Amino acid sequence: MKSHKSVRLISGIVILSVVFTLASTAGPVMAADKEEAQGIVDKAKVTLEEFLRDKNYSWVNEHINKEKGVLIYPQVLKAGFILGGSGGTGVFLARNAKGEWSQPAFYTMGSVSFGLQIGGEAAEVIVLCMNQKAVDALMTSKVKFGGDTSIALGPVGAGAKSNVVADFVSFAKSKGLYAGLNLDGSVVDVREGLNQAYYGKSLTPIQIVVEKKATNPGSSALRAALKKAK
């Protein structure tokens, strides 16, 4: 009997140790993820403002507040499939019928090869969602550009007025210069961990973007920058 009691006691101690260990590490991990998420939001604002100031991307400035939504990636690596962490994570925001921008949801982007025409190591990327089909596609867990949805390079140059017929329209620059970044075949996926860290609970993109189940005041500057576009 004593041996059984000893086994139960030891088992209980082990379980408690595991619980305390998980509890002690969960806080710092969540805090680090939240800090990373806010950093991406802040960098997305900088990327957006750089595009809006650049006369070569006047098309973005003129259309961003007419379309359904936008993906903003502060940094996309030249090649290699990106599964989160540094370099391949951005934010998606949708615009409702009143012209109000949603809270950001976090997404990764990856491809076998992005093929930057100017040979840069990384690029800043903005992708406009031109219709409801594009927004609906992003509400699923994963989207492949050029699969069920079409994507095209956006018009570049001062005074560009070209009409583009596609679900998504992309723009990219590397070190401040135009980058002909072909995103056809790239995969965009929800980064659930950052969404949870940023809002303090597990949420789907629909709950964040459409149903407005949570807010984070840290996104206000980014949303204000979007609203300022023409």
Give short role names for the model-derived ranges.
Residues 31-230:
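Small-residue-enriched, tightly packed secondary-structure blocks
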Residues 12-24:
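Bacterial N-terminal signal peptides
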Residues 24-31:
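Sec/Tat signal peptide C-region and signal peptidase I cleavage site
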Residues 1-8:
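N-terminal secretory signal peptides that target proteins for export/translocation
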